[in-house]
């Protein structure tokens, strides 16, 4: 290479190597010859680097002899540039709570801050680190009504981050968030849990704090002097999947574990779930477990878990349990692709509020070592469609019944279930919608044999409007399943009682 723009008399744009098969061949990459760095954009014939640009990354162009050593520096960074790596860490989640007029906030595995809203200049005052408090903790909760600030997965020696123990609990003196050293005259104290390798999260319940490790559930109850709190194990093999994967409603806690869905209301129960295989066969529990979050929609008695699928690094799916309509023998579950990274119930704003992370939208600033993206803020249960930055998107929904067939026998007042021996004819469908906006689509899926693939009736699917009194179906099969759905914008419906 000569000491000119391309090294070949000013006209060449390529460099020939003895072997370039191990060099990156797509995108903009870099090599180093002597002290000069050169970029290139392609590799041809296994030996030729094309699209070269000399003297990049602040280096100086120089002449190089044939046979000079060429080093691939595509993964190198220049002085002052940010470097990236493949280290996987837990996300920097926050724990938030109130201590009277003070807002308490803890960054995961970090320090705890306070912000006093009662100050006359509160809106002009930054939050400050709480003095005397632990400096590295996984989670934090304010215990009520006794008013202790409790840290989970915290330091055994206050102020020494290297002593952080993921199973260690420390709580402050009553009414004093600056005092954590136990003495004969205060109620501060500590406790280490035994079942599990780390405390995943905690949530305040009606009469206790539910403390979850990765394998078990503990109940932390205020008992007064001399122990301040009691700790009792309430379950095993029921650990919490992620810090925010639990909600409490009406004295019962519901959470998602690596071993299924659970409920605690005085005793541990495994929630019967009709979609458990569907969820757990396609969920990212490796790097995505801390992204799992639970949301409560008490307007409709729904508990939702938002989670990343097995091939996704961001939340992209949802599973929902309806505790209003469920019974032990008939649990009500739904699944979907609603992706929310935060959910706040209607108790605060009157309607649920939630956040949606969009990895495909660039930020206005550079992000190094992670994906760029933006977050949209939604108010739910408003209207019929999704309105994101003025763009209207239909909220589609569907429900399909199980197959039903004709009852063929009746003996002494007992009706026996049909076994598909007879064909049945359905002449018409009479809509029974409690409420309906826009059009709804009805499909009759027909089968003549158990192994048949369900197919729509020849005249279907049928479009039902609010003024439709009946539709003639002229369908015939041994087994029929009813599917109700909406696919367009401005549509919603409620079927039955």
Predicted segments, located by residue:
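Beta-propeller and closely related beta-pinwheel folds
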Residues: 76-89, 121-292, 334
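Beta-sheet repeat architectures centered on beta-propellers
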Residues: 93-95, 197, 237-252, 258-497
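Autoprocessing Asn-cyclization modules and mimics
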Residues: 1-74
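Short loop/turn segments that connect beta-strands within the blades of beta-propeller domains
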Residues: 33, 99, 107-109, 145-146, ...
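Hydrophobic or amphipathic alpha-helical targeting/insertion segments
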Residues: 101-124
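Secondary-structure transition/turn motif
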Residues: 18-21, 51-60, 108, 118, ...
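Extended assembly-interface regions of large multimeric machines
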Residues: 1, 74-101, 369
């Amino acid at each position: 290479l000569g000491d000119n723009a391309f090294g070949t008399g000013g006209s060449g744009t390529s460099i020939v190597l003895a072997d370039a098969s191990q060099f990156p061949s797509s995108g903009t990459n870099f090599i180093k010859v002597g002290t000069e760095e050169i970029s290139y954009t392609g590799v041809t014939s296994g030996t030729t680097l094309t699209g070269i640009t000399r003297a990049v990354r602040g280096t100086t162009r120089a002449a190089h002899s044939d046979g000079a050593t060429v080093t691939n520096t595509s993964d190198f960074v220049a002085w002052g540039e940010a470097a990236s790596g493949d280290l996987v860490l837990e996300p920097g989640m926050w724990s938030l709570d109130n201590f009277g007029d003070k807002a308490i906030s803890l960054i995961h595995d970090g320090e705890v801050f306070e912000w006093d809203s009662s100050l006359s200049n509160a809106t002009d005052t930054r939050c400050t680190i709480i003095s005397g408090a632990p400096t590295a903790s996984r989670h934090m909760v304010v215990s009520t009504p006794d008013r202790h600030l409790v840290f989970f997965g915290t330091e055994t020696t206050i102020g020494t981050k290297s002593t952080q123990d993921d199973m260690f609990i420390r709580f402050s003196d009553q009414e004093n968030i600056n005092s954590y050293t136990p003495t004969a005259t205060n109620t501060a104290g500590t406790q280490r849990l035994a079942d599990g390798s780390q405390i995943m999260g905690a949530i305040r319940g009606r009469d206790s704090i539910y403390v979850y490790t990765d394998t078990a559930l503990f109940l932390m109850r205020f008992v007064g002097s001399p122990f301040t709190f009691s700790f009792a194990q309430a379950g095993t093999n029921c650990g919490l999947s992620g810090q925010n994967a639990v909600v409490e409603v009406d004295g019962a806690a519901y959470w998602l574990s690596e071993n299924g869905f659970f409920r605690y209301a005085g005793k541990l129960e495994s929630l019967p779930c009709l979609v458990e295989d569907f969820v757990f066969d396609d969920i990212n529990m490796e790097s995505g477990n801390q992204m799992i979050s639970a949301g409560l929609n008490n307007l409709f008695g729904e508990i939702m878990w938002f989670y990343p699928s097995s091939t996704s690094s961001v939340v992209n799916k949802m599973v929902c349990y309806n505790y209003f309509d469920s019974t032990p023998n008939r649990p009500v579950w739904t699944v979907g692709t609603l992706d929310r990274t935060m959910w706040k119930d209607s108790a605060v704003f009157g309607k649920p509020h939630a956040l949606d992370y969009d990895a495909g939208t660039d930020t206005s600033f550079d992000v190094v070592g992670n994906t760029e993206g933006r977050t949209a803020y939604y108010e739910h249960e408003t209207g019929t469609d999704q309105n994101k930055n003025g763009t209207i998107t239909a909220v589609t929904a569907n429900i399909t019944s199980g197959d039903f067939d004709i009852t063929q026998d009746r003996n002494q007042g007992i009706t026996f279930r049909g076994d598909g021996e007879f064909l049945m004819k359905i002449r018409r469908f009479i809509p029974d919608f409690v409420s309906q906006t826009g059009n709804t689509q009805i499909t009759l899926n027909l089968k003549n044999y158990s192994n048949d693939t369900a197919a729509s009736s020849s005249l279907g699917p049928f479009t039902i409007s609010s003024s439709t009194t009946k539709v003639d179906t002229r369908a015939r099969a041994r087994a029929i399943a009813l599917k109700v759905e909406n696919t367009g914008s401005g549509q919603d419906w409620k079927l039955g009682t």
